[in-house]
Amino acid sequence: MTSFYTSLNGLKNSQTDLSTIAHNIANAETTGFKKSSVEFADLVANGSAANPRMTQGLGATVAGINQNFGLGAIEQTGRSLDVAIDGDGFFATRNPENNEVLFTRNGNFQIDATGALTNFAGKNLQMFETDATGALVNPGVTVDAIIPVTNAGGADLSSLVIQNDGLISATYSDGTTEPVGRVALASFAAPTGLRPVGSSNWEATGFSGNPTFEAPDTGRTGQLRSGALEKSNVDLAEEMVGLITAQRNFQANAKAIDTATQFSQTVINLRT
């Protein structure tokens, strides 16, 4: 019966592989999405006194589902509040309701009625405060990106631009342009330890380490590409090959179960 359970584990592993590949394919067009792959490990029956030449295999198990944070294609949109990261950094967003900070590669932002620069879910983009020249005031502290809807002269906000160096510049109806802040990018010692929470967002864990916040093009964060978005890093051709392989593995394990069942039936028939 060992072969039956070994093949049953193989079926479950193939299902996990198929589900992961299907998830990748479904998100091939999701902005900032990062693909995943399943890592398997073999199982053996052994003990301290076991003869290594007699060690019996017990199949395989899922060792982990690994995220691939390789860069996706950067696509120009021409929109002033779209920005892509050409490097390893993450945008940080804060939920104003519970102060939860999440990290994303999706740089599609908009400004709401209060002047807050947010993502599609209403989370506030994090930035560094700057002085009138664009220099960082307090490099170690991030704040919500809040844009004054009127300047000191009472002129209304007319446009907003995120530049390649992360500087957020506001232009007002009187023709003046003022720096508001600089986008803060987060980096991690082990980004594969980030926990995905959906909508191309991740949260920090003990496996990823705490975030390090830096200005764009500093350390490992990478440069910004204004007027562009990072597409998913899913390669559909590669996923289709993996899908076929996973399907064949599933079929092979199902056949092994069928064979084990026939063996068992033969033994039962011998006893009757």
Language model segments and positions:
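Residue-level detector of intrinsically disordered, flexible termini
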Residues: 143-147, 151
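Solvent-exposed, low-complexity segments and loops of surface/extracellular structural proteins
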Residues: 131-144
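Amphipathic alpha-helical polymerization modules
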Residues: 1-134, 150-272
